[in-house]
Amino acid sequence: MRFIAWLITLAENSDRIAEAAADRLRAKLGGHTDMVVRIVHFLLITAGISSPLLMYFAGAPLPVHILVYTAFFTYLIVYCIFPELKKYPTFRLRILADGTEQILAFFVTGIACLGIAAYTIWAAVCSVIPTLTAVSEGIVLFCAELVIFWNGIIKVYCTSVQLGLKYRVWGIVLGMVMPADLVMLVLIYRITRRECAFETEKALLNKSRRDDQLCRTKYPLLLVHGVFFRDSKLMNYWGRIPAELEANGAVIFYGEQQSAASVEDSAAELADRIEQLVQKTGCGKVNIIAHSKGGLDSRYAISKLGSDKYVASLTTINTPHHGCLFAEYLLNTAPEKFVKSVEKIYNSAFKRLGDPNPDFLAAVTDLTNSRCEQFDQDTPDAPGVMYQSVGSHARCSKSGRFPLNLSYPIVKKYDGDNDGLVALTSAPWGEDFTVLHPTGKRGITHADVIDLNRENIPGFDFREFYVQLVNKLKMRGF
């Protein structure tokens, strides 16, 4: 009971104990502390795994065997709590880093275990060691590696964002298939190691500039979603972007319009929402950041429904201001019966989810090239409101996830460079147009630009882009 109580106390005070130990070691070892700690752990684990052989050749009595086994597995428990002493800005990142470190330990000590296991089998066959020693060695080796592996994999599965569902499922499916399981484990290690390094850097950056309040704009932000989605607390349409903006001082509200309706109907909902926010908070105006069709909804509300007096700026993200030939192609070529069937299923499903009157066909129709051409003529910009836009494009069909990987080549055929849905030539609007060019082979899709998939893309930091975007609004007095 005392041992269990000690373990509970150790876990409760783990952060403080780890930080104190790390500070003392860094004072002595300097910048090599983390590597030294890692090597020491690997050596101790290897020595512990080899302990049955070592004690046999040393002629150790039974009490020493019991003492060594107890000490080794107590050490393993402590190692599961403190695999490294490096500090991390959040609890999630610390657990993620610990799990990643333990996966590495499993690999490194596993290589040593192959040699130990091979020698044990040879020694037992040649009668160099008794069968009991060989069995003891096998049990200790198996249990130690099992503890290290499962501790590491459970930690990264529970805390990693970048693994996503795909890698988690593949990890389980290939878990018992040699050597695919080892290849998958290497991939998981690489993903979580990069995630931990990137997220730690971001957290430290936000901490260092917290007092600067980069995103504390004069007017709050209103984030307006695109078509076929709803604002949800369970899964934020804007991914990790709102949390990043709020960490830098932003005040954020959401459009809360239906998932699919005509531009006119969605705009009416937005206009009511904006007026209610202004009256309730006394903020005077809002800065709208709208994605996809949300940009058209916002333009209509500002120009036609009197929201111009409540809106300081409108920033559209990958909005099809000049329409989507892809949408027009679908409506013109798809069988009417099929379109009606999809419409019925969609409207029924989203009505159950809370939309009062979803209208799939009206939403898609208002995104067509011909409808948007007329919309642009009938919806001039309101004076006194600052308009600007952002667009991006993918590199190829493999850049995006389903269904963007299927729609990209079709949009490419009709509209050229696109994000999987919206052509780059359709996105410009207002006094300034920012193009987000992909730096690698992947590109930036319609979903990527709002962090819908919560995926870190090498070469472009979406969250930092939005921080700087909002900071520019602040610097301009909005």
For the regions a language model picked out, list residue spans one by one.
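Solvent-exposed loop/turn segments at secondary-structure junctions
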Residues: 228-229, 259-260, 293-295, 320-322, ...
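Serine-dependent carboxylesterase/thioesterase catalytic core
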Residues: 37, 41-44, 51-64, 225, ...
